[in-house]
UniProtKB/Swiss-Prot annotation:
ATP binds at Q87, G105, E106, G107, K108, T109, D512. This is Protein translocase subunit SecA. InterPro entries: Helicase_ATP-bd, P-loop_NTPase, SEC_C_motif, SecA, SecA_DEAD, SecA_motor_DEAD, SecA_preprotein_X-link_dom, SecA_SF2_C. Its cofactor is Zn(2+). The gene is secA. One of its GO terms (molecular function) is ATP binding. It is a peripheral membrane protein. It catalyses: ATP + H2O + cellular proteinSide 1 = ADP + phosphate + cellular proteinSide 2. Zn(2+) binds at C897, C899, C908, H909. GO terms for biological process: intracellular protein transmembrane transport; protein import; protein targeting; protein transport by the Sec complex. Keywords: ATP-binding, Cell inner membrane, Cell membrane, Cytoplasm, Membrane, Metal-binding, Nucleotide-binding, Protein transport, Translocase, Translocation, Transport, Zinc. Monomer and homodimer. Part of the essential Sec protein translocation apparatus which comprises SecA, SecYEG and auxiliary proteins SecDF-YajC and YidC. It comes from Pseudomonas syringae pv. tomato (strain ATCC BAA-871 / DC3000). Its EC number is 7.4.2.8. May bind 1 zinc ion per subunit. The lineage of its organism: Bacteria, Pseudomonadati, Pseudomonadota, Gammaproteobacteria, Pseudomonadales.
Length: 913
């Protein structure tokens, strides 16, 4: 009730923050005259002066006004660009660990230099994060002269970079790279077998460009390093032949079945579900082709892998469409980023879905993979001591940034007021009418020599628009987002008079559309341009620039609404940069995905009430509000999914931290002999307690079992029964001491055969390998647990609590297994003296062999596969990402062993040999 009044009196929180920062801006401005008077050498010397002051205890906050003044003056001298006052506010926002929302064309890259320079003075390193390699190289090379003028070093990390080069890039004061590369290097560092093989320092400060794209859009997408698993391509081919025989079950809204079938498709949650008839039909077909034994159920434990293949095939056929979710190029399935429209070479869907799509398209089916290490961007970026970001559109996601990352969003005032005109949406009955109206709008703009940008949601739509324009004889350029460099060049010239560009979603393009085109690109394309040529190019550009402004600026046409308002705002933001004129219009139809799934009924009834005819459009605020409500509904659902996924991944993340801390401690340790001794004692205590229960009578002791277990785990035969017969005073504790003494004698003999130094090195290598092997299996087990945990909701149990409880038990078993398996390997192995150089060469060969088998996946979560029950036991759809289940009958670590011993598989044939 009083909120509007209080806001009127005191201003919004954002306005109050801007006022606070303006006071600091005045202090920065006061330093300007002093900085102008300095020579280049004196200005550069300021960097060393600041470092010395930090060493004496001065904080970065205290240095900020003077450091910003130095960076601003350096920008003027090196790049001919002076930071505006609002850009100084943006730099302060980044330094304070917040997200700066700045409109297109407000100079985000230049703003970043302020916070980057200030924080690089600490000597702990700054990571600048971009969405693709092209932007990382472009921004690093663009800003390198500024940083080097100030005495700072700049590095760029790229895929397939030589290790020494990458290590040097991370050691630089400022490092540029992509979110993927930073994440993969973090995982690689935690698979290293030597401290010298690691790349990254402590994660200090990161500035994320297009922060919404990385922390929101890709939050559900895990980074996975995997190795190849068994080949099951024949199974995918067989399943692919059966899927087309299944019929979709379709119902009317009232519940009347219009087409009975075998499975249902839910477009909202992107799920497919076999019904009873479908289960029966697919079981019959699988039995016919010999994939399922006669009388067996698809839901038997050993057939769950087959069931996963069936669902993968169904989803490949019914939820993934060519030229929408993926394209086929050079015999490969390339995924298309739904947010940017770019193809994503190298990324693969998990759970066998990618192989199912390859089978559907009759392509060569690539082998499945097993996860070796994984993390999510949500958990990786939360490891930084301080995190900040920049984007043109973050305010709509401010709640999620705060909830997940504790990041506040600060809307930075524009340097010039917005002059763009945003027209109301036009809604048509059919897509055909909508496209016809778009073509008419394009013709009208081109008649006035206005540049036009048409944004589409899919490659399929952009190609359809291109065909329509070709039929009309209208010249245009199409961007299907395959080559970043070419793409940036086309976008740079999309503001020329009469230019028509069709592009998939414009998120993360990183290139401004300048009215009249980009004269700097023209100059760059000339070999050794003369001053006269440059002057002529500038003069020509000035004429074109004025011509476009007089025509009304860039006109942005959107062929449909995206699920996220933020993506729509990014497309709109292409027009009207830095106070330029421009306009935007969204064209919709009731056949669009968003309208059909979420908003069509209300709008359709409204249009019928108006008695609309074919070809007519409705332009009304009520319609726009209905669409925005639908978008908010989708955004809310997607936020719930990401939050739910994070809550589950947080459990794995805590375990990941423990394992990675253990590995780092091992790598840093010179001698782990004490650790191995502790392991030996714990394993022995466990064995003795298992066979000689505390407070038990000698008649209850399983002496034969203890002798066998000691032989299995320690490779030592001990006549325990004989000792007991010979010494009546032997009790549990004294027996344990006698066994330990014998074990130490046997182990010391190994040390004599090699050397203490060689054995210590061998112990470290074995422990690291055991940790990695068991962690890999643990990841698989955790994924499978998460995959089925939603079923606990039907038993009135909280799936999250159940998942936490069971994962804790699994993790405790993992730690016990690490100790036992390490001791077992060290006890059984025969050691010999090895030349240090020979050992180093062998380890290097093994590391290279492992690296050659690794695959780096940033595979989008495969839709909303299994519903996870919420706190009340209802179902919340969640994207589940797990290791693809293979056709071989793989036993879980906690299942009974296949040999019939009655032991768990992990305690029998599942142990490390």
């Amino acid at each position: 009730m009083f909120a509007p009044l209080l806001k009127k009196l005191f201003g919004s929180k954002n306005e109050r923050e801007v006022k606070r920062m303006l006071k600091t801006v005045q202090i920065v401005n006061a330093f300007e005259e002093q900085m102008v008077a300095l020579s280049d050498e004196q200005l550069r010397a300021k960097t060393e002066e600041f470092k010395a002051r930090i060493a004496k205890g001065e904080t970065l906050d205290q240095l900020l006004p003077e450091a910003f003044a130095v960076a601003r003056e350096a920008g003027k001298r090196v790049m001919g660009m002076r930071h505006f006052d609002v850009q100084l506010i943006g730099g302060m926002t980044l330094h304070e660990g917040q997200i700066a929302e700045m409109r297109t064309g407000e100079g985000k890259t230049l703003v970043g230099t302020l916070a980057v320079y200030l924080n690089a003075l600490s000597g702990k390193g700054v990571h600048v994060v971009t969405v693709n390699d092209y932007l990382a190289r472009r921004d690093a090379n663009w800003m390198r002269p500024l940083y080097e003028f100030l005495g700072l070093t700049v590095g760029i990390v790229t895929p397939f970079q030589p290790p020494e080069e990458k290590r040097a890039a991370y050691a630089a004061d400022i490092t540029y790279g992509t979110n993927n590369e930073y994440g993969f290097d973090y995982l690689r560092d935690n698979m290293a077998f030597s401290m010298d093989d690691k790349f990254q320092r402590e994660l200090n400060f990161a500035v994320i460009d297009e922060v919404d794209s990385i922390l929101i859009d890709e939050a559900r997408t895990p980074l996975i390093i995997s190795g190849q698993a068994e080949d099951s391509s024949k199974l995918y081919t067989e399943i692919n032949r059966l899927i087309p025989k299944l019929e979709q079950h379709i119902e009317e809204v009232e519940g009347e079945v219009t087409k009975p079938g075998h499975f249902t498709v839910d477009e909202k949650t992107r799920q497919v579900e076999l019904n009873e008839a479908g289960h029966q039909f697919i079981e019959e077909m699988l039995t016919e082709v010999g994939l399922l034994a006669e009388g067996e159920s698809l839901y038997s434990a050993h057939n769950l892998g087959l069931l996963t293949h069936v669902y993968a095939g169904l989803r490949a056929h019914k939820l993934f469409n060519r030229n929408v979710e993926y394209i086929v190029q050079d015999g490969q399935v390339l995924l298309v980023d739904e947010h940017t429209g770019r193809t994503m070479p190298g990324r693969r869907l998990s759970e066998g879905l990618h192989q199912a799509i390859e089978a559907k398209e009759n392509l060569n089916i690539q082998a499945e993979s097993q996860t070796l290490a994984s993390t999510t961007f949500q958990n990786y970026f939360r490891l930084y001591n301080k995190l900040s970001g920049m984007t043109g559109t973050a305010d709509t996601e401010a709640f999620e940034f705060h909830q997940i990352y504790t990041l506040a969003v600060m809307v930075i005032p524009p340097n010039k007021p917005l002059a763009r005109k945003d027209f109301n949406d036009l809604v048509y009955l059919t897509a055909e009418e909508k496209y016809a109206a778009i073509v008419t709008d394009i013709k009208a703009c081109l008649a006035e020599n206005r540049p036009v940008l048409v944004g589409t949601a899919t490659i399929e739509t952009s190609e359809h628009m291109s065909r329509l324009l070709n039929n009309e004889g209208i010249e245009h350029k199409v961007l299907n987002a395959k080559f970043h460099e070419k793409e940036a060049e086309i976008i740079a010239q999309a503001g020329r008079p009469g230019a028509l560009t069709i592009a998939t979603n414009m998120a993360g393009r990183g290139t401004d559309i300048l009215l009249g085109g980009n004269w700097e690109v023209e100059v760059a394309n000339l070999e050794d341009p003369t001053p006269e040529q440059i002057a002529q190019i500038k003069a020509d550009w000035q004429k074109r620039h004025q011509q476009v402004i007089e025509a009304g600026g860039l006109h942005v046409i959107a062929s449909e609404r995206h699920e996220s308002r933020r993506i729509d705002n990014q497309l709109r933001g292409r027009a009207g940069r830095q106070g330029d004129t421009g306009s935007s219009r969204f064209y919709l139809s009731l056949e669009d995905s968003l309208m059909r799934i979420f908003a069509s009924d209300r709008v359709k009834n409204f249009m019928k009430a108006l008695g609309m005819q074919s070809g007519e459009a409705i332009e009304h605020r009520m319609v726009t509000n209905a669409i925005e409500k639908a978008q908010r509904k989708v955004e809310g659902r997607n936020f719930d999914i990401r939050k739910q996924l994070l809550e589950f991944d947080d459990v794995a993340n805590e375990q990941r931290k423990v394992i990675y801390h253990m590995r780092n401690s091992l790598l840093a340790a010179e001698n782990i002999g004490d650790t191995i001794a502790d392991f030996r004692e714990e394993v022995l205590n466990s064995l003795v307690s298992q066979h000689i229960p505390p407070q038990s009578l000698p008649e209850q002791w399983n002496v034969a079992g203890l002798e066998a277990a000691l032989n299995t785990d320690f490779a030592v035969k001990m006549p325990i029964q004989q000792w007991l017969d010979e010494d009546d005073n032997l009790h549990e504790d004294s027996l344990r001491e006698k066994i330990m003494a014998q074990l130490l004698v046997a182990y010391n003999e190994k040390e004599d055969q090699a050397s203490a130094e060689a054995l210590r090195s061998f112990e470290k290598q074995i422990l690291l390998r055991v940790v990695d092997d068991l962690w890999k299996d643990h990841l698989s087990t955790m994924d499978h647990l998460r995959h089925g945990i939603h079923l606990r909701g039907y038993a009135q149990k909280n799936p999250k609590q159940e998942y936490k409880r069971e994962s804790f038990t699994l993790f405790q078993e993992l730690l016990d297994s690490i100790k036992r398996d390490t001791i077992r390997v060290l006890s059984h192995v025969q050691v010999r003296r090895e030349d240090p150089e020979e050992e180093e060469a062998r380890l290097r060969r093994e590391a290279e062999e492992l690296a050659s088998r690794m695959q780096f996946e940033h595979a989008p979560a495969p839709g909303l596969d299994q519903p996870l029950a919420d706190e009340e036991g209802g179902e919340v759809p969640v994207a589940v990402v797990s290791e693809p289940i293979r056709n071989d009958q793989k036993l879980g670590r906690n299942e009974l062993c296949w040999c019939g011993s009655g032991k768990k598989f992990k305690h029998c044939h599942g142990q490390i040999n």
